[in-house]
Amino acid sequence: IAVLQGQSWPRFWRRWAQVVGCAALVSLGSWWMFPHSWISFGVLHGMALMLLMVRWLLVRGWLRGATPWVLGLGAVLAAPLLSALLQSHGSPALGAALQSRWWNWLGVVTEKPPTEDWVPLLPWLGVMLWGAGAAQWWWQRRTSRAVRTAGAAERALALLGRWSLSYYMLHQPVLIGLLMAFRALSAAH
């Protein structure tokens, strides 16, 4: 929708830099807490890469009509198909390379990598492409009813949407803190 509304490149890059910065903080924090299973390609890392890819495709007009739906389906199906092919016919060296932290972000693996969060390019690029397709579909069919004055619930949801990265970055420390407090209280009794 941002592309359809004419979001400028400087505004896109500013938001993208925020996502990348938060992804780096997640990696550093998880490395500190979980040195053997730190997050090298989680939700924010995946979003940063996929935002670049999808925006690039959108501004070139390559995601029109059924294209994002078809490409999305291809990306969703590619991960399990390529992983099965790798497991049955791939070389052990290629399998080990794709399983490594340096390449597992592609999503062509035979087992889940040892990490606390993992959102690989395949299949998740497909889901983001479906989101781009859904946004375009909605944009083309919006009516005057869709631009009416928002009610209280809609304004609250819009506020959450505008600050979603902040909420995302706060939810893990809050949840971990609550779990640690619960554990400490449980151990005391």
Over which residues does each language-model region extend?
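Alpha-helical transmembrane segments and their immediate juxtamembrane cytosolic regions
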Residues: 1-189
